[in-house]
């Protein structure tokens, strides 16, 4: 890895990793090469970017402390706002650089995703993006089958949170990092994609590989509980009906509301985030 990339990666990791995140560098060109122009990131190909994902540890290290600090405010989406807060700290830690941050949920006015998170994770070498095209002579006929990323250490027990772009920093010699193919057999890939598309509520697709760490039972219960009841589950008081202003020492942003992706997208590289019905948790 180039010294410049290693230095920036270390600084970003110092900001995010203590809170349960991982970061992976990639070139914008690697991402753009897989997609039609409408989905390209509008930066020179050698531009340095970092993919950010959350591990199971993020729940205890980042989300719960964030909720405890903000639980008397009306949060529209606590997980996304927690992630936005921590990604904002990356910008603060590198004030000398121009930084653009795209969260996984962001969309253009026409609802086109600003980043195709699973494609970015694949090209960054963070997680293998398993798709229908990875199954020879697949058994699904005319059914729509969405793809899913699997992490070599966490299986499906992680979430892609966004990308950090560094316009003006170009790394043409950065070597590509291939994602680890941790579900190599046809039978296991079929089981993974069927579990993700048809049985996602039971969490089992996330165990496509034996994970080093899973979501805790508390974390699973949190994401399986209706949003209005989640704070009570953690022993926190419910906020008042009117949003209170954020404190000056804990800034956070309000993400755009989420809407489902366009189910008519034909090319599998265009699948946004995690696409089956509203999943019980990230």
From Swiss-Prot:
UniProt entry keywords in alphabetical sequence? Cobalamin, Cobalt, Cytoplasm, Disease variant, FAD, Flavoprotein, FMN, NADP, Oxidoreductase, Phosphoprotein, Transferase
Upon changing residue 161 to G, the result is: In MAHCC; results in decreased stability and decreased methylcobalamin dealkylation activity
- Please provide, in alphabetical order, the Gene Ontology terms of the cellular component aspect for this entry: cytoplasm; cytosol
- What are the EC numbers? 2.5.1.151, 1.16.1.6
Identify the Pfam families for this entry. MMACHC
What residue spans carry the region label Disordered?
234-282
Q: Which cofactor does it need?
A: FAD; FMN
Catalysed conversion reaction: 2 cob(II)alamin-[cyanocobalamin reductase] + 2 hydrogen cyanide + NADP(+) = 2 cyanocob(III)alamin + 2 apo-[cyanocobalamin reductase] + NADPH + H(+); apo-[alkylcobalamin reductase] + an R-cob(III)alamin + glutathione = cob(I)alamin-[alkylcobalamin reductase] + an S-substituted glutathione + H(+); apo-[alkylcobalamin reductase] + methylcob(III)alamin + glutathione = S-methyl glutathione + cob(I)alamin-[alkylcobalamin reductase] + H(+); apo-[alkylcobalamin reductase] + adenosylcob(III)alamin + glutathione = S-adenosylglutathione + cob(I)alamin-[alkylcobalamin reductase] + H(+)
Per UniProt, subcellular location reads as:
Cytoplasm, Cytosol
Result when mutating residue 230 to Q:
Reduced activity in dealkylation of methylcobalamin
What GO biological process terms are annotated to this protein in UniProt? cobalamin metabolic process; demethylation; glutathione metabolic process
Q: Quote the InterPro entries the UniProt record gives.
A: MMACHC (IPR032037)
Domain of life of the native organism: Eukaryota
Q: In which tissues is it expressed?
A: Widely expressed. Expressed at higher level in fetal liver. Also expressed in spleen, lymph node, thymus and bone marrow. Weakly or not expressed in peripheral blood leukocytes.
Chain positions with Phosphoserine modification: 245, 247, 275, 279
Q: Any binding details for the cofactor?
A: Can utilize both FAD and FMN.
Residues annotated as binding substrate are 104, 115-118, 129-131, 149, 160
Primary subcellular site in the record, as a coarse category: cytoplasm
What is known about its subunit structure? Monomer in the absence of bound substrate. Homodimer; dimerization is triggered by binding to FMN or adenosylcobalamin. Interacts with LMBRD1 and ABCD4; the interaction ensures the transport of cobalamin from the lysosome to the cytoplasm. Forms a multiprotein complex with MMADHC, MTR and MTRR; the interaction with MTR could modulate MMACHC-dependent processing of cobalamin. Heterodimer with MMADHC; the interaction might play a role in the regulation of the balance between AdoCbl and MeCbl synthesis.
Query: Family, per the entry?
Result: Belongs to the MMACHC family.
**Related disease?**
Methylmalonic aciduria and homocystinuria, cblC type: An autosomal recessive disorder of cobalamin metabolism characterized by decreased levels of the coenzymes adenosylcobalamin (AdoCbl) and methylcobalamin (MeCbl). Affected individuals may have developmental, hematologic, neurologic, metabolic, ophthalmologic, and dermatologic clinical findings. Although considered a disease of infancy or childhood, some individuals develop symptoms in adulthood.
Q: What is this protein called?
A: Cyanocobalamin reductase / alkylcobalamin dealkylase
User: What species does this protein belong to?
Assistant: Homo sapiens
């Amino acid at each position: 890895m180039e010294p410049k990339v290693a230095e920036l990666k270390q600084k970003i990791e110092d900001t995010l990793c203590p809170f349960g995140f991982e970061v992976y560098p990639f070139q914008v060109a690697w991402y753009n090469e897989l997609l039609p122009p409408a989905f390209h990131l509008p930066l020179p190909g050698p531009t340095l970017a970092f993919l950010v994902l959350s591990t199971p540890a993020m729940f205890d290290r980042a989300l719960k402390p964030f909720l405890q600090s903000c639980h008397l405010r009306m949060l529209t989406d606590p997980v996304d706002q927690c992630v936005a807060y921590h990604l904002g700290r990356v910008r603060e830690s590198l004030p000398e650089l121009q930084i653009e941050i795209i969260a996984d949920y962001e969309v253009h006015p026409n609802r086109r995703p600003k980043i195709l998170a699973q494609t970015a994770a694949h090209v960054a070498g963070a997680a293998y993006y398993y798709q229908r095209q990875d199954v020879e002579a697949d058994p699904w006929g005319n059914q729509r089958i969405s793809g899913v990323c699997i992490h070599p250490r966490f299986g499906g027990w992680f979430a892609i949170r966004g990308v950090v772009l560094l316009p003006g920093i170009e790394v043409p010699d950065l070597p590509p990092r291939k994602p680890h193919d941790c579900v190599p057999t046809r039978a296991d890939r079929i089981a993974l994609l069927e579990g993700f598309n048809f049985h996602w509520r039971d969490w089992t697709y996330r165990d496509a590989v034996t994970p080093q760490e899973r979501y805790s039972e508390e974390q699973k219960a949190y994401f399986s509980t209706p949003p209005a009841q989640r704070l009570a589950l953690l022993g926190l008081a419910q906020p008042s009906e009117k949003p209170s202003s954020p404190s000056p020492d804990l800034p956070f942003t309000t993400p755009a509301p989420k809407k489902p992706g366009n189910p008519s997208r034909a090319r599998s590289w265009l699948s946004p985030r995690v696409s089956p019905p509203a999943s019980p948790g990230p």
